[in-house]
Every structure is written in C-alpha cells, then in structure tokens.
Amino acid sequence: MAQPATPRTMAEKVWADHVVAHGIGEGAAREPDLIYIDLHLVHEVTSPQAFDGLRLANRPVRRPDLTIATEDHNVPTVDIDKPIADPVSRTQVETLRRNCAEFGIRLHPMGDAEQGIVHIIGPQLGLTQPGMTVVCGDSHTSTHGAFGALAMGIGTSEVEHVLATQTLPLRPFRTMAVNVDGELPPGVSAKDIILAVIAKIGTGGGQGHVIEYRGSAIESLSMEGRMTICNMSIEAGARAGMVAPDDTTFEFLRGRPHAPTGADWDAAVEAWRQLRTDPGAEFDTEVHLDAAELSPFVTWGTNPGQGVPLSGAVPDPELIVDEGERQAAEKALTYMGLQAGTAMRDVAVDTVFVGSCTNGRIEDLRVVADVLRGRRVADGIRMLVVPGSMRVRAQAESEGLDRIFIDAGAEWRQAGCSMCLGMNPDQLSPGQRCASTSNRNFEGRQGKGGRTHLVSPAVAAATAVRGTLSSPADLSAVPAR
C-alpha cells in the first residue's frame, strides 16, 4: 500500500476511507461530509422515534444486515422471566421488539444467549472490527474504538438517518494523541489510566477531537482494558477514542462468530495493519502521561474529571484558582456530603457496583473474584456484580466465579446496564454512596440523590471488603487453608 504524500493519523485514514461525498464550501461554512456507516447498533431507549420516522415516511431500513439490536438499558437483572414491572421500561422493550420484527432487524432480547450491553456484545460477536465506522444512539459507542474503529454516539434523528441511508453527515474532527509510556505499577489498571487522563485534561479537554491512545502502557493492555479506556473518551469531551490494532486485537477477534476466516482473515489482518498512524503524522493536540507515576484513582465529585489518587484527599475548593471550577467543586462537595481534606480511604460506602459497558467484561469479573476469594463483603454493604452480557455470565459461571461472588456475600445478577444509570430497578436511594465501576458520577446518575465514586474493578472489590474506598493492597492476607 503506497504511502500518501501527507502522513495521516489512524482516524484520518478511517474517515477518508468512508467518505461518500465531500461537503461543499470552505472553513466554518463548509457542509458536512457524508460518511458511510459499517455497523449500526440499536437499543430500546433511543430508537423508538427513529423507527416511527421511517414508518411515517414509508421507508425501509436500508441495510438491516449491518444493524443489530439488543435490550440493555431498561432491563431488570433479576426475574427476567417475568414481565418488566415499570410501564415505561416495559413499553420501550416491547416497542423495540415490534420494530425489529417489522423492519427485519436482528435482535437479542432478554434471556437470549447473546443478549447484553450493546457495547459488549458487538466486540464479543466479532461484529466490531478495525477500520470500521460504528454508530449507536448511545454516547459510549466510543468503546469500539479500542479495535481501531471510528465509533461515535449519535442522536435519535441521526439513528433514523442511518437506518434509512446507512450514511451520516458529519463534520471533520480534530485529532489528539494521549501518550502513556512506561510500565504500569502493580495494581494499576486501564480504569485508573483513563480517570487520570480525564483529571488531567478535564471533561472538556477532548472537545471536538478524536483521541488516539498510544504508548507502551496502552500497547500492554488487553482488549478489555483498551475498551475501558476508549469507553470513557466521552467523559473527556471527545467525539471518539481509538487504539491502533495489533496482534492483541487480532487474537481477540480470531474465531469469533462474525470475524473473517481463511484467506479473508489473512487479507483482513494485512489491511488492518495499515491503519496505524503514519510516521510523521501530526496531531492537533498531544498529551503525555508517565505510566510509572500512576496509581489507583477514584473520583470525589460529580463529574469524572473530579478525581484524585486513592492515596489522596478530597481537595479544598478554596485552593482552586479558576472561579468556575471552584464553584463547581463547592457544589459537588455539598451534593456528595464530603469535607475538604478527608482522606479518600476514609470515605465509607453503602453500595458497590461492578458492571457496565466500562467494566462488565470477563477480565473485570476475574479481577473482582481474585480479590473476593476467601473474603467477605463487609457488614452493611450491598454489592452487585452484573455481567455485561449473557455470554460473559456463562463464562464466569463456567469458571466458578459466581460461587466466589455469592460466597463472599455479593449479589450475582443477569446481564444489563443495571446500576450504571437510573433507568431500571437497580438504583441507589437518596444519600446512599456507591463505589462504581461505571463511567459517570453525575448527580442522580445511579438514582435520585445517589452519590457515586468511579473506581476500577480491583478498588471496587477491596472497597466491598473494607467498607471504605480501598485497594487490594489495603486488605489483610487471606489465611491459608
């Protein structure tokens, strides 16, 4: 493959490969480009109005073979064989089923072996592949960028546009490189990396950019870890996040249901290797982190950028120079019920949630099981362990992880978005505090008045055992049997 005259970033390559028509005009007045979409993921919350629009215009779905749906946001994680109790949630799920049947779209409903969170089932089925454009009516579609795909969340009107045309008008983006080099210390995970990145650049630092995560620490991560990082690109304000595909990517995809096979596989891998950013390509912005200086990270406030190392303390708003940030910190501390100067390890929780499209994969559950093995959840702590898909659930049970969770006193649930967001029965009560492996700690995100601390799976498990924000290093050794 001949090198272009101007070196390009990976994101620029994927964009260029999918332009159906270039926008007319110059500068701010230029029209959007028309981009072809390779994979469209659908769920019950953002799709009903889109299907209604098709129906009113008497339009079919242009490429139902490139569209796949699942039920995730509103589904209960217990008693899934019974009718959904909440009428709004039940209506949304039933509507998705009718729409998929009418328009010929493949659906994985509750109880199906492949049902789960939309951003977990795409990769596990091999639907998400390097060099693709992927969209979904969900902000955390950026997860799929871990495969070298350009993956973006879209709104309901855009969902309708993709269903009708398999294209989307989009404006070109700026590019950002987040370089994380060096060796991660023991106990530091992908979740800690991305929380540290967001704390460094802020929740608006990536606005208008596609972030490419680079460096030796990123390359050392598993695909699960890379998905965690790309998943939270949106919390940094970015349009999308990406990691260049490599042998780790290819081994994850090999043999999956929708991955190429035989000669097609060999040709695909050869093409995927060409996606890496060209030597000499320039990014609009570059950020650098030293992996060796990272440690377990937790949030203290009400946005993902309000975070500190677990070894740190709740910051004092009076020491924040920017007036807007100071006021935001004061408001956050009032909502969170925290005092400046409080050691993060002294913050007690009521609930621990393990799951979500950020950390609901089998690797995450193995980490939690390793911490809980031979230990008990602290008295008064409720711990929910929610697999991100039914396939993850089955794998965990085949490895005996469910018994470790249950024996420790945790609740082992069915697949779904669960306590990540207050759209289903798994919610916090007002004033309850949760250590959560999810991606957002906004006011009321996990239930009205609920208080959320974003953490890694390892920190979540250790917190469940001690009852306060903790890492596995804080736990006493398990007695030998």
Swiss-Prot record:
Signal peptide: none annotated. Its cofactor is [4Fe-4S] cluster. The keyword Lyase applies. The keyword Endoplasmic reticulum does not apply. Disulfide bonds: none annotated. Pathway: Amino-acid biosynthesis; L-leucine biosynthesis; L-leucine from 3-methyl-2-oxobutanoate: step 2/4. Binds 1 [4Fe-4S] cluster per subunit. Keywords: 4Fe-4S, Amino-acid biosynthesis, Branched-chain amino acid biosynthesis, Iron, Iron-sulfur, Leucine biosynthesis, Lyase, Metal-binding. One of its GO terms (molecular function) is metal ion binding. Pfam families: Aconitase (PF00330). Residues 429-441 have a biased composition (Polar residues). It catalyses: (2R,3S)-3-isopropylmalate = (2S)-2-isopropylmalate. Residues 429-451 are annotated as: Disordered. [4Fe-4S] cluster binds at residues 357, 417, 420. It comes from the Bacteria. One of its GO terms (biological process) is L-leucine biosynthetic process. Its EC number is 4.2.1.33. InterPro entries: 3-IsopropMal_deHydase_lsu, Acnase/IPM_dHydase_lsu_aba_1/3, Acoase/IPM_deHydtase_lsu_aba, Aconitase_4Fe-4S_BS, Aconitase_4Fe-4S_dom, IPM_dehydratase_rel_enz, IPMI_cat. PANTHER family: 3-ISOPROPYLMALATE DEHYDRATASE (PTHR43822:SF9), HOMOACONITASE, MITOCHONDRIAL-RELATED (PTHR43822). Belongs to the aconitase/IPM isomerase family. LeuC type 1 subfamily. Heterodimer of LeuC and LeuD. Catalyzes the isomerization between 2-isopropylmalate and 3-isopropylmalate, via the formation of 2-isopropylmaleate. This is 3-isopropylmalate dehydratase large subunit. It comes from Mycobacterium sp. (strain KMS).
